[in-house]
Amino acid sequence: MPVRNYEISLTETQALKGIAIIAMLVHHLFYTTMQYGALVNHIGWIGKVCVAIFLFLSGYGLTFQYMRNTYNSTARGTLKFLYRRFVKFYLNYWFVFLIAVPLGVFAFGRTLDQPYGTDTNHWLMLLTDFLGLNDVYSYNITWWFNRLIIIFYLLFPILFRLTAYKPLVLLSLPIAYLEPSFCPFYFGIVVSRYRENVNTFLNRLPAWSIVLMAAVMAILLCFVRELSDIPFLHGTNIDALTTLCLALLIVGWANVRPTDYRLLTYLGKHSMNMYLVHTFIFLYFFSDFIYQFRYPVLIVLALLLTSLALSIVIEQLKKVLSFYKFQDYLLHKL
């Protein structure tokens, strides 16, 4: 029997990002309102799993890249690794920041008083926001995620070394589960580091049973997330487990029926830009336009298409300005 590959490929990573960005839009559109009914509100809350998916993929991807080169295990190698990661993150964030903030202030009237308050030093707040450190007090409230991922990037070398000891991993996993933000990132590191062991184990099971089990568990966990009152088995605590099931479903299905997940991967490639801009569209500047479509599916589709269109424009602008050439220059500078 041929050996199946259950490692998460780049295509499958992008597909999962595509799922995550759709979940993010659904979450932000509906989690604060009962206007469209209780079911839609619950689905909006379930969409919060997007955070866990992005964190899991970050932990998995960082570990995969880190292990590809033994030079990374040296102090200089680790610094170079983090430098390259931060260059990619900050350049893409700053590109949108430097367009969106001036445009928001001067064209749409979203002054700095609104996100930063009237009793703060706006220049200092703008600087810390530019560095991705403002949490929910960012010019765009959705950018709170920036500070979280920056912290995890800095912690990554330490966490990677801790996962070298299997007994410590087994002891730490239940503890990690107690912290909803940390858990998926740490799970990503562990799964990636021991992906050969995971692959060996999954190859002992029938391919279809893995897909079926992952699908059933993902659906069940969504119900449990919203309906359970059991401590640590509801809300964001359970999102890391749901993410594992979704990842297994995507990878498992690719082993049963080879697919390139074309639509999801396309969205995944634009997920960073869509994350950075979608709140400007549906919350700050064009709320009436998005919600005028009345039906939840159409509302999501409207935000999805407008966010995607804006991302495409951003990518075209990057090409015109030789953004990626400049990024490559900086990546190879150190």
Please tell me what each predicted stretch does.
Residues 1-174, 210, 258, 266, ...:
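Membrane-cytosol interface segments of multi-pass membrane proteins
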